[in-house]
């Protein structure tokens, strides 16, 4: 449970849920200080028995930053004292997933609730890091890289499925002709209309390049996840690029496809009713617009310091040009 109501698209940058260590009882006190700090968009919020909650930790009056706590949400099917949840309401898509808000009212957690692989509070109330030179939230944020690759793949999979279903419809849809062809040939099909035929071909070419790039990012990230290492700057940039590029490419192609198939796009079985899924992808694991601004800022900062921006001339930069390159997508950088 990371996202908070007030944070909006700055999820992860804004976290006001509080966890204070009570040395007298050797417990953490988890609290939502105001409504804007309530956890929001929490999947399985109505069914989960346990949750990993991100909260700003204070030990001995000193703030030590965001940390993760494993806690019981429910015991015996009932919410634990101090925890309240609510329905976020009907969404435009994904209503099979129960997204809830969660509020904590001075919920007490044992000292063992702190996920302490990288930092801990001992029985005397002393805070100490266990992993040198890496803030605990950086290790938590490591999972964002996995999420960005997964979001990119999800957007590409949705696009592929929508195009597959729509192509099958278009190939079976006759286009009325003013007169029969002298040869007796069957009526032309919707898929043969030039603009639709061109869009199908364009989509295959563009998607193949983006999919190749995302796949390379996954291949480079996987061994780092196994060892717990953080990606280098070039791979971080490439993964962010992959997420933005995959989602924006899918949005562009799917929206254009919708314009070409008329009232078919209004049918519930067509798949177009779930186009807002791509909006979910746009905002998940880092809003694409903010993520793009961050990438630009980081590269300008490197340039201002006289350093070659991450990736040089660069694999990540190349991903932004993959639609104009005749060869396959640029390889994802190694560490």
Indicate where each model-derived feature is located.
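A short core secondary-structure module
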Residues: 27-84
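Short beta-alpha junctions and helix-cap segments that line functional grooves
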Residues: 15, 40-42, 87-90
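Short Gly/Pro-enriched turn/cap motifs at secondary-structure boundaries
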Residues: 6-10, 43, 91-98
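Short beta-strand-initiation
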Residues: 12-15, 48-50, 64, 97-99
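A gly/ser-rich beta-alpha-beta helix-loop segment of oxidoreductase catalytic cores
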Residues: 1-19
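Internal glycine-rich alpha/beta core junctions
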Residues: 21-29, 71-334
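Long amphipathic alpha-helical scaffold regions
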Residues: 15-22, 34-35, 54
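Sensory/regulatory domains in signal-transduction proteins
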Residues: 5, 36-38, 283
């Amino acid at each position: 449970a990371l996202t908070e109501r007030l944070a909006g698209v700055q999820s992860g940058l804004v976290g006001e849920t509080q966890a204070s260590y009570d040395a007298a009882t050797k417990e953490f006190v988890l609290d939502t200080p105001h409504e804007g700090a309530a956890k929001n968009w929490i999947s399985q919020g109505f069914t989960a028995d346990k949750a990993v909650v991100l909260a700003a930790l204070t030990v001995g009056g000193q703030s030590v930053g965001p940390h993760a706590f494993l806690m019981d949400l429910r015991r015996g099917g009932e919410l634990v004292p101090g925890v309240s949840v609510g329905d976020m309401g009907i969404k435009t898509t994904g209503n099979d997933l129960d997204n809830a808000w969660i509020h904590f009212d001075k919920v007490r957690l044992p000292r063992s609730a702190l996920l302490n692989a990288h930092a801990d509070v001992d029985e005397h109330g002393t805070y100490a890091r266990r992993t040198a030179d890496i803030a605990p939230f950086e290790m938590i944020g490591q999972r964002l890289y996995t999420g960005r690759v997964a979001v990119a793949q999800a957007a590409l999979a949705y696009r592929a499925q929508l195009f597959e279903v729509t192509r099958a419809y278009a190939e079976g849809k006759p286009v009325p002709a003013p007169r029969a062809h002298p040869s007796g040939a069957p009526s032309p099909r919707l898929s043969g209309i030039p603009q639709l035929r061109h869009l199908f071909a364009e989509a295959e070419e563009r998607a193949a390049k983006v999919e190749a790039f995302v796949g390379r990012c996954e291949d480079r990230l996987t061994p780092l996840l196994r060892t717990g290492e953080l990606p280098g700057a070039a791979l971080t940039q490439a993964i962010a690029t992959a997420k933005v590029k995959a989602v924006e490419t899918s949005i562009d192609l799917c929206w254009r496809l919708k314009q070409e198939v008329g009232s078919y796009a209004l049918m519930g079985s067509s798949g177009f009713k779930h186009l807002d899924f791509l909006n979910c992808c746009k905002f998940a694991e880092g809003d694409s617009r903010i993520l793009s601004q961050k990438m630009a800022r980081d590269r300008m900062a490197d340039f201002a310091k006289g350093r070659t921006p991450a990736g040089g001339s660069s694999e990540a930069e190349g991903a932004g040009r993959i639609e104009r390159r005749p060869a396959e997508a640029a390889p994802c950088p190694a560490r």
